């Protein structure tokens, strides 16, 4: 089994490609199940955010796994494989695990050190686990990377004062207008990005803030926090006609601000308008950028501002490289030891079987034993067995990560009289126990 990651992100693909390859949350379970049915795919998790679409998979062979991952992407999004392929990246085994650690900790994000991706990765794993597309390897891996990312944010404080996309949006507005005093702003969408933007706008002298959202209750909650007004979708163009700045961030699948509407609106408007679209797929039709005085920015346009991350946080990233390498090494040592788990289980079961035989013999030879005495003897015998097995099992685990592991394990099995039948029966017993639980 091999760990293989395939994806595209803000490093490898422009926004006009990324927005075509986003998995809708409502279809994610079906996508996971469909991918699992592909040849070579044994486990999978799909991570799909505004800046990346990545699939982490366990495959039986690397070369067939790569092909079937690409084929799945092409089929799911109904695009030619040749059109997608130039934007895809692949990471195998240690590179794949290293990459996932960095992604989850926010070290590969457009916004270095941001914590939003941690929640997104955790959510992606939970959906895959509930859907039944993860197994032993990915369950262990994702638990480890989530725990690591939480520790990184807590111990290094890399996320403190992180330059966010919403911050960058506000900086672009300041650059265009010089001062935001007395400006009118409209926020379309009432999610986390809008809330962050409002926090960054605090104290800038904005004269008028209007929040528009399909679910009015969500807009009202945000409006109460920032003394803003609430508008409706039906009246959106009326609010835009008097706005200086518009920030758009919704989960809509198609643009909600159309070129034909904006052409009319801007022809009747005497002032310019800055529109910042941080939705993916994009919420504003790209052709709007050709309208005079309509200044349109999308996520990729904000990258230059975001890249102004502090030198101090960059140092933290470099310092974490060695820590991540250690985590990756530990994971693969654990994976190697998986191969001896059935052997250990069979050894324990054989020892317990011998205990049961001995206890039965003891009961027959010493019928005068009380129940309490019988139980105490059984406990002591089990303790002796555990102590006797502790060192051999520890040595077996050490053998499993050495170069000649297969030969050493075979010697171990022969010394303790373990047959393939013993191991097979032990595995079946374990499977039955897991099914019952």
Swiss-Prot record:
Gene symbol?
Answer: hemA
- UniProt KW keywords: NADP, Oxidoreductase, Porphyrin biosynthesis
Assembly information from the UniProt record: Homodimer.
For the site labelled Important for activity, the residues are: 99
Q: Which PROSITE patterns would you find in this protein's record?
A: GLUTR (PS00747)
Q: Which family does it belong to?
A: Belongs to the glutamyl-tRNA reductase family.
The entry marks the following residues as binding substrate, namely: 49-52, 109, 114-116, 120
- Provide the residue positions that the database annotates as binding NADP(+): 189-194
The UniProt entry, under Pfam families, shows: GlutR_dimer, GlutR_N, Shikimate_DH
What name appears for this protein in its UniProt entry? Glutamyl-tRNA reductase
Q: What else is known?
A: During catalysis, the active site Cys acts as a nucleophile attacking the alpha-carbonyl group of tRNA-bound glutamate with the formation of a thioester intermediate between enzyme and glutamate, and the concomitant release of tRNA(Glu). The thioester intermediate is finally reduced by direct hydride transfer from NADPH, to form the product GSA.
Question: What top-tier enzyme class does this entry carry?
Answer: oxidoreductase
